[in-house]
C-alpha cells in the first residue's frame, strides 16, 4: 500500500505529538493519581498528610 507524502507527513507529525505528550505527561499524571488516592496508612495506623510540600521535603 502506497502512502502519499501528505499522509506520511501527517502520520509522522501525529507520532511526534503523541511521543511528546506521553513523555511530558507521564509524571504529572502519576502525581495526580497519587494525590487523588491519598497516602496509605503507616504500619502503626497513622496517615501522613499528602501535600506538595511533603512531596518535596518528605
Swiss-Prot record:
Keywords: Membrane, Mitochondrion, Mitochondrion outer membrane, Protein transport, Transmembrane, Transmembrane helix, Transport. Its main location: mitochondrion. The keyword Mitochondrion applies. Residues 36-58 are mitochondrial intermembrane. The chain crosses the membrane at residues 17-35. It is found in: Mitochondrion outer membrane. GO terms for cellular component: mitochondrial outer membrane translocase complex. InterPro entries: Tom7. One of its GO terms (biological process) is positive regulation of protein targeting to mitochondrion. It is a single-pass membrane protein. Residues 1-16 are cytoplasmic. Pfam families: Tom7. It comes from the Eukaryota. PANTHER family: MITOCHONDRIAL IMPORT RECEPTOR SUBUNIT TOM7 HOMOLOG (PTHR46722:SF1). Belongs to the Tom7 family. Forms part of the preprotein translocase complex of the outer mitochondrial membrane (TOM complex). This is Mitochondrial import receptor subunit TOM7 homolog.
Amino acid at each position: 500500500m502506497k502512502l502519499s507524502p501528505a499522509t506520511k507527513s501527517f502520520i509522522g507529525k501525529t507520532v511526534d505529538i503523541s511521543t511528546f505528550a506521553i513523555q511530558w505527561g507521564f509524571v504529572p499524571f502519576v502525581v495526580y493519581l497519587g494525590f487523588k488516592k491519598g497516602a496509605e496508612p503507616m504500619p502503626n495506623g497513622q496517615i501522613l498528610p499528602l501535600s506538595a510540600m511533603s512531596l518535596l521535603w518528605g
